[in-house]
Amino acid sequence: MDSKNCVVIAIAGASASGKSLIANTIYQELCEELGTNQIGMISEDSYYRDQSHLELELRKLTNYDHPKAFEHELLCSHLKMLKENCSVNIPVYSYTEHTRTLESETMTSKKVIILEGILLLNDSALREQIDVSIFIDTPLDICLMRRLVRDMAERERTMDSVLLQYTKTVRPMFLQFIEPSKQHADIIVPRGGKNRIAKDLLKTRIKYLLGK
């Protein structure tokens, strides 16, 4: 098999399923093995569409768990550019302002790019850019508890607003779009980020694709 110059890994699953934990763990371990300048990580959240033209109260009403909330075409374009050894400017999203900031983060081409997000496997064009995909399969009740703690502590949300959003959009969109997308995953991972075997399997596959 010909080795790849750039391997793209997608880690998908429900909100607060443990995607970030496993993504960060793999990122840190690969940085130690391959070098920090060879590994990049991109959050799908960075590609929420710009809503600066809307008033803040209207931005709060957006369904952020629907595929249309993301500018996946820009993410696809950036992945193609990174594979062609070009640099890209990744948007910076504000969870408190519910839109992109005026800043961006520059990423250069990497040997391994780790994507993390809820709807990475729902978009067929995006799937074509992905070399290995995993779906974190965590029970929804656990996801909800984690989401409550996270959003109240880190995103200045109230318990009522988190529960209302979960009932109106998060759970319905998971059942309609996110859960069905796991059929496209190469690996389905139970127990979230604590699944050591899944992490080791993924790292082995990455090294194989890199020809290591």
Swiss-Prot record:
It catalyses: uridine + ATP = UMP + ADP + H(+); cytidine + ATP = CMP + ADP + H(+). Its EC number is 2.7.1.48. One of its GO terms (molecular function) is ATP binding. Transmembrane segments: none annotated. One of its GO terms (biological process) is UMP salvage. It is found in: Cytoplasm. It is an enzyme of class 2 (transferase). ATP binds at residues 13-20. Pathway: Pyrimidine metabolism; CTP biosynthesis via salvage pathway; CTP from cytidine: step 1/3; Pyrimidine metabolism; UMP biosynthesis via salvage pathway; UMP from uridine: step 1/1. InterPro entries: P-loop_NTPase, PRK/URK, Uridine_kinase, Uridine_kinase-like. One of its GO terms (cellular component) is cytoplasm. It comes from the Bacteria. SUPFAM superfamilies: P-loop containing nucleoside triphosphate hydrolases (SSF52540). Keywords: ATP-binding, Cytoplasm, Kinase, Nucleotide-binding, Transferase. HAMAP family: Uridine_kinase. Belongs to the uridine kinase family. This is Uridine kinase. It comes from Psychromonas ingrahamii (strain DSM 17664 / CCUG 51855 / 37). The gene is udk.
